Structure formats: structure tokens, C-alpha cells
Regions:
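Glycine-rich phosphate/diphosphate-binding loops and the adjacent beta-loop-alpha structural elements
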Residues: 155-209, 220-223
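Glycine-rich phosphate/pyrophosphate-binding beta-alpha loops
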Residues: 98, 201-234, 301-305
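Gly/Pro-rich interdomain helix-loop hinge
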Residues: 225-290
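Short, amphipathic C-terminal "tail helix"
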Residues: 289-324
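A short, small-residue-rich loop immediately preceding and capping a beta-strand
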Residues: 60-96, 218
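Short glycine/serine/threonine-rich phosphate/pyrophosphate-binding segments
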Residues: 8-10, 30-33, 50, 73-80, ...
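A glycine/threonine-rich phosphate-anchoring loop and its flanking beta-alpha core
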Residues: 80-164, 171-172, 248, 252-255
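ATP/NTP phosphate-donor binding region
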Residues: 1-65, 281
Length: 324
């Protein structure tokens, strides 16, 4: 995979990869980036509904590559199409989601209100351009950055952790903890936007190298059921997941706290979430009477199985209730 900084390097990257007839996979917001010569699919929707993947796959006929411009939903849509078509993907992320680093993706079944997963996408390149994040709304900046922080935290203690992922996770957590308050205070500060994007890059690499844990499993189950923003859900779910894992992952959480320049990682994560405007699931629109069903869905997810501490349905229900 080739990584470049600066959108000016984009054309050369496509040429290097031999992509001449790309499909631009995005939302209407990003259709005016000077890529008008690309075939366009601008029907990306949150949580990647299955019918969106079908439509994007049809649009890709005759193309020799996919260019995803946007956040996790745009990138996951392109990855789902890549698996169906074999086409390579170039990602131009405009949020801090980290989706550009992994071959896996989620697709939502809207009728059943569940989100499933897949893998095997061909990620060929990434282009980071901090200026594309300047217009990102405050809530989306905070939510996607806290999603990236969750990638860092979980990479340190999940079943698939390793030394290289640890290094990426600690670098990412430190950068995010320093930069996020600055970005939330002034979203037009390009220097801190770049620092936050660098933190998200490290977080994505940590995610790719290690995998996800319980906090993400909770957010995924909630997102699939209610169609709520993935970043906001991770912001709320990460602190209780860290607390739950403290008895078995104390050393990892101490390293996380040191990277974040704090004495307590869970408290700092909750403070950052509160600063970004995320504190309670009910404030996001999650109904209390569905928490039992959500807990049952959480324990079936891969992140729960990879978590260092076994979590029962009752455990998860208690965690969800603590932040409802």
C-alpha cells in the first residue's frame, strides 16, 4: 500500500497504480475536488446500506479502480465494491475514522437493523490532505477522532495485539489526546488538523495490525440497530469498556494513560468525549427498552470475542446502562 500526503500527489499515485478509469465513490459534498473526469457515484449513505453497495457496484462496470473520498461510509462502500469486483481502492479520507487502513468493512441490513462485516478489499493507496478536514463539523471531528482513539486503546490489549501495533497505537493516542482539544476549540487551525490526521493515521495502522475490542463491538451493534453515527457511539462506549478491562489489562491501560499524558485513560477518554459533546446514549437517541437486545447482539460480535476479559450479556447490559 502506498501512502502519500498532499492532494497534489493524487494524480501521480493513480498513474503509478495504473488506474486510468476510476470510479469516484463519495457523497455530493465532495464532488467538486477537481476530479470531474472520473466516473461518479455520489450515493454513499451512513452505515453502508446493502442497496447502496449494489448501486455502486453497478456504477463500477468498465472502471479499473475505485477512489473513495470521504469518511468511513464512503471508504467502506468502496471496499465492499472492491470485494465484489476485484478493483483496487485509493482512499482520500476526510475524517479521522481510519477505515482506509483495513481490508474489512461493514454493510447494514436496513430491514433487519443489523450490521454485518466482510473483508478482502484491495487497498492500493491512501492520500492524506489535512485541508479536506477543515470543513468537518465539530461533532464529526470529535466523533471520528474518538473512534480513532478507540482503535488505539483496543489495539493495546485485544487478542491480536503485537509490538508494531502497540507502537502505532501509542503514537496515535498521544497525538489524538493532544490535538483533539485544539481542533475542537478552533476547527480552522490547519496545524492541529494535520496533527490529528497524523494521529488517526497511526490509529488506523494499529487497527489494521491488531483488531477491535469490546467498545467497538458495542458501538457496532448500536449503529447497526439504530443507524447512529459510529464515532459518537464509540466516544460514549470507549470509557466503560476501558473500565471493564482494567482488571485484566492494567499494564496496557497504564501505557495508554502515559501516552495520553494522564493518570487515568478511561477518565481522560470520557473527558474528551464530553468536550466533543458526547456523554450519554440516550442523548444520541438510543431507547432504554432496547438495551437488552443490543447486549445480546454485542456478545456475538468479533470484537467481544477478541476482548481480553470475557463479557456476558449481563456484563454488556450493565455497561450500556452505565452510559445510557
Amino acid at each position: 500500500m502506498i501512502v502519500r500526503w498532499d492532494l497534489n500527489s493524487y494524480a501521480a499515485l493513480l498513474a503509478e497504480l495504473g488506474i486510468r478509469r476510476p470510479l469516484l465513490v463519495t457523497t455530493p459534498r465532495w464532488t467538486r475536488l477537481g476530479l470531474e473526469d472520473h466516473r461518479l457515484f455520489d450515493g454513499v449513505r451512513p452505515h453502508v446500506p446493502a442497496d447502496t453497495v449494489e448501486a455502486a457496484t453497478a456504477a463500477a462496470r468498465g472502471c479499473d479502480g475505485l477512489v473513495a473520498v470521504g469518511g468511513g461510509s464512503a471508504i467502506d462502500t468502496a471496499k465492499a465494491v472492491s470485494v465484489r469486483t476485484g478493483l483496487p481502492v485509493v482512499c482520500v479520507p476526510t475524517t479521522y475514522s481510519g477505515a482506509e487502513w483495513t481490508p474489512s468493512f461493514g454493510v447494514r441490513d436496513e430491514q433487519r437493523r443489523v450490521k454485518g462485516g466482510g473483508g478482502g478489499a484491495r487497498i492500493a493507496g491512501i492520500v492524506y490532505e489535512p485541508e479536506l478536514t477543515l470543513s468537518l463539523p465539530r461533532a464529526e471531528s470529535g466523533g471520528t477522532a474518538l473512534n480513532a482513539l478507540a482503535h488505539c486503546a483496543e489495539a493495546l490489549y485485544v487478542e491480536g495485539r503485537n509490538d508494531e501495533a502497540d507502537r502505532e497505537a501509542l503514537a496515535g493516542a498521544g497525538a489524538i489526546a493532544r490535538a483533539l482539544p485544539r481542533v475542537l476549540a478552533d476547527g480552522r487551525d490547519l496545524e492541529w488538523r494535520r496533527a490529528l490526521l497524523e494521529g488517526a493515521m497511526h490509529a488506523g495502522a494499529a487497527l489494521a495490525g491488531a483488531g477491535l475490542g469490546l467498545g467497538h463491538a458495542m458501538a457496532q451493534a448500536l449503529g447497526g440497530r439504530f443507524g447512529l453515527p459510529h464515532g459518537a457511539l464509540n466516544a460514549v462506549c470507549l470509557p466503560p469498556a476501558l473500565r471493564f478491562n482494567e482488571p485484566v489489562a492494567a499494564a496496557a491501560l497504564e501505557r495508554l494513560a502515559q501516552a495520553m499524558e494522564t493518570d487515568d485513560a478511561a477518565t481522560r477518554a470520557a473527558d474528551l468525549a464530553r468536550l466533543a459533546g458526547f456523554e450519554r446514549l440516550r442523548e444520541l437517541g438510543v431507547p432504554e427498552d432496547e438495551l437488552d437486545a443490543v447486549a445480546e447482539a454485542v456478545v456475538l460480535r468479533p470484537g467481544t470475542r477478541a476482548n481480553p476479559r470475557r463479557a456476558s450479556v449481563a456484563d454488556v447490559r450493565e455497561l450500556l446502562g452505565s452510559v445510557w
